[in-house]
A protein has these predicted regions:
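Short basic, glycine-rich beta-strand/loop surfaces that mediate nucleic-acid
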Residues: 10-12, 53-63, 76-106
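Short, solvent-exposed amphipathic alpha-helical segments in soluble enzyme
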Residues: 26-29, 73-77
């Protein structure tokens, strides 16, 4: 990868859920951790570079579940590391609610 390119992880959240800041942070952390574990298997050199350069992340929002699933589908089709978080339902939202998509690093 050229030195000017930065590896980035993108976290895409659902705006319609109106999660508390803490819940949203936890869901993003789940997505990030799963993406790192996947990247460790699929591209450990890029993951190492990503971590050494500060593990840059960008958080974006989509309006609803349909949009979240579209983002996830496109990331998978593009061959990117990605993970769709499904909540366990212990706190704010029902079990099985899909909350965040993590994409990258890449």
């Amino acid at each position: 990868m050229p030195p000017t390119e930065e590896l980035t992880m993108v976290l895409v959240t659902r705006q319609d859920l109106q999660l508390s800041k803490g819940k949203l942070a936890a869901q993003c952390a789940h997505a990030s951790a799963e993406c790192v574990l996947s990247a460790k298997k699929s591209n450990p050199r890029s993951l190492d570079q990503y971590l050494r350069r500060g593990a840059r992340k960008i958080v974006c929002k989509v309006p609803n579940l349909v949009s979240l699933k579209q983002v996830h589908s496109r990331a998978k089709k593009a061959g990117l590391v990605c993970h769709l978080v499904t909540d366990a339902g212990h706190t704010e939202i029902p079990p099985g609610t899909e909350t965040v998509v993590g994409i990258g690093p890449g």
